[in-house]
Amino acid sequence: MPLSLDLSIGLTLSERLLTQPPVPPARHLLVPDWAPERPFERPPVPAAVLIALVRRPEGHTILYTERSPDLRAHSGQVAFPGGKLDPADASVAAAALREANEEVGMVPGDARVLGYMPTYYTGIRLTC
């Protein structure tokens, strides 16, 4: 019995993703060629994003959001749904699903987490 397109995509993605959230390595190992003008002034803030593969009649699409131009941080940016981890979040996956619900109304129970990407420090600090 051949795999359906949905199952085939899910299997391919889950084979290439991490099975659990990674333990963050030292900063210099994450982005070895990145040399900021100054080192981080504050400890990084744990956050999570959801890279949602959405099934539509015309095929699968990736979900992006456009952040409001009125926001203090990351205003006007196109981004994956996501944000800071809250103390009540049971995991980074729970945080990403909660943020997707808050930002675009995605019901967490409708999602299936296929895996995790490696931790990445952006080093972004916006000043206005």
Give the positions of each predicted feature.
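N-terminal leader/linker segments that precede catalytic domains of diphosphate-processing enzymes
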Residues: 1-79, 84-128
